[in-house]
Amino acid sequence: LFRSLLVTIPLNMGADFVARSGLGNELNLVPVDKQTLQSKKFDSIFVLGDANDIPASKAGSVAHFEIDVFVDNFLEHIADEPMTGSFDGHANCFIETGHGKAMLIDFNYEYEPHEGPFPFSFGPMKLLEESRLNHLGKLAFRHVYWNVLLKAWPLPGISRQKKKPLNA
């Protein structure tokens, strides 16, 4: 018996109002500097999340990590100071694989998804490894997101910048 699976990713288009505004490109995404998140067309506009054209995932973690860079850069910009924040394209996400297991990936502009411990040098989770612990981490993340991250509470040992992989 011959089996095949075709996996396709639909074209990710930005919102129609972005096109109507004149800010967007042919994909209705706003072109920005990928490090500062500042519009390439209007220096008073910064764009975060799904609306910008950075070469990164459109996952919520990207927007979350963009916030810190944006806040610092925006405050420096309105104070007429040079912007010092630089977004590194950091993204991470859990991928459910079924049967109570999941994988976890972590990457940025420089480093593709890689194996290794997460979030500390000893784990307890493993990147690019299917496990029950990663699945439980995904389930726990909902609570952490709503009760810790949104309140901007710091998590010990967790950096918003992607750390160099141990094997790089």
Where are these regions (language model features)?
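Short, surface-exposed, charge-dense and proline/glycine-enriched linear segments
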Residues: 8-14, 78-79, 88-94, 107-125
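FAD-binding beta-loop-beta segment adjacent to the flavin cofactor pocket
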Residues: 28-46, 97-118
